[in-house]
């Protein structure tokens, strides 16, 4: 067969095969390219026939070979684009989303049980006319201890192991410094001070089922004229009933805190057994929930408040303890370990 005719037939047959290829023929396209244009391909075999042509015909056929090679090379490149586009389109169609289908319900998170407890307690106090005041977690020794009637040589400082950053800077061991700063700024000509200060506090405790090196407190303070122990008891009675039920009673036991005088521990009648005695109240009928007392005159005087004219009461409770009592939780570490099997229960 004439070499020129073979070249034309190779061009035509290859072009026809290329037109039949779609997105599913990526491998076939590559195989055909090797078969036609490869080192051992059809076009290379035809080139070998040039040596048998006459000197006059050889340049003419050689030019035709180059033209066919260029045409087929371009054809392969264009068809490769067509095949790739078809492949992408097929993939898009197979992965398309039916927008008429109902959406998938996502798993939603919720507030942590300690956050829920804190917000509930804050709402109770807001309803009683208290203001919520935030403060610094990194605090000065002066506000954390000295302003709470705990000078540097006071033995009661041993009651709280402290994380010191420097000799004068520490992680607060209670939220009482917020109260000291607020008393400094309050204008008593506009009425009494009624505040709570919630937040994290830090003490050098060994973590176990009932202790943690960090936990949460809400401390409350009321300062004004003629504030009495009766006001404190009435406030605590209302708080206990709001948190644990309207039938709850409280009792006050003498205690000691450097910043209050007199000081008391506050117990609430057991909400599980109604005061009859059970494992929750350790057969006593009462559960300790917080500490409180009348603000020490020295604490008032350090804020420039006339202790002869003004008096006040203070109290402090822990959100973890309240939550543990309400929900029957026996290990405080569960609040901080991030185990959703625990947190999802609340």
From Swiss-Prot:
PROSITE patterns: AA_TRNA_LIGASE_II. One of its GO terms (cellular component) is cytoplasm. One of its GO terms (biological process) is phenylalanyl-tRNA aminoacylation. CDD domains: PheRS_alpha_core. It comes from the Bacteria. The keyword Ligase applies. Its EC number is 6.1.1.20. The keyword Glycosyltransferase does not apply. Tetramer of two alpha and two beta subunits. This is Phenylalanine--tRNA ligase alpha subunit. It comes from Streptococcus agalactiae serotype V (strain ATCC BAA-611 / 2603 V/R). The lineage of its organism: Bacteria, Bacillati, Bacillota, Bacilli, Lactobacillales. The gene is pheS.
């Amino acid at each position: 067969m004439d070499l020129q005719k073979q070249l034309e037939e190779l061009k035509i047959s290859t072009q026809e095969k290329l037109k039949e290829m779609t997105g599913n023929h990526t491998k076939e396209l590559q195989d055909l390219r090797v078969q036609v244009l490869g080192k051992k391909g059809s076009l290379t075999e035809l080139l070998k026939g040039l040596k048998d042509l006459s000197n006059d015909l050889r340049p003419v056929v050689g030019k035709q070979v180059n033209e066919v090679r260029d045409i087929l090379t371009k054809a392969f490149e264009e068809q490769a684009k067509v095949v790739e586009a078809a492949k992408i389109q097929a993939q898009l169609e197979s992965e398309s989303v039916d927008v008429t289908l109902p959406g998938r319900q996502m798993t939603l998170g919720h507030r942590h049980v300690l956050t829920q407890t804190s917000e509930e307690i804050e709402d109770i106090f807001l309803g009683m006319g208290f203001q919520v005041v935030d403060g610094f977690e990194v605090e000065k020794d002066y506000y954390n201890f000295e302003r709470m009637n705990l000078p540097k040589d006071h033995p009661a400082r041993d009651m709280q192991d402290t994380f010191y950053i420097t000799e004068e800077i520490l992680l607060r061991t209670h939220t009482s410094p917020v109260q000291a700063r607020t008393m400094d700024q309050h204008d008593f000509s506009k009425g009494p001070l009624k505040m709570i200060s919630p937040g994290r506090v830090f003490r050098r405790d060994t973590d176990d089922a009932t202790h943690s090196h960090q936990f949460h407190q809400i401390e409350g303070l009321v300062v004004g004229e003629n504030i009495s122990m009766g006001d404190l008891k009435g406030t605590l009675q209302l708080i206990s009933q709001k948190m644990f039920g309207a039938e709850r009673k409280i009792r006050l036991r003498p205690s000691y805190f450097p910043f209050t005088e007199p000081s008391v521990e506050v117990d609430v009648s057991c909400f599980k057994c109604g005061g009859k005695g059970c494992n929750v109240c350790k057969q006593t009928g009462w559960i300790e929930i917080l500490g409180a007392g009348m603000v020490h005159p020295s604490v008032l005087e350090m804020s420039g408040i006339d202790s002869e004219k003004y008096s006040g009461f203070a109290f402090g409770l822990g959100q973890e303890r309240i939550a543990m009592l309400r929900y029957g939780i026996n290990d405080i570490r569960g609040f901080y370990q991030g185990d959703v099997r625990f947190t999802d229960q609340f």
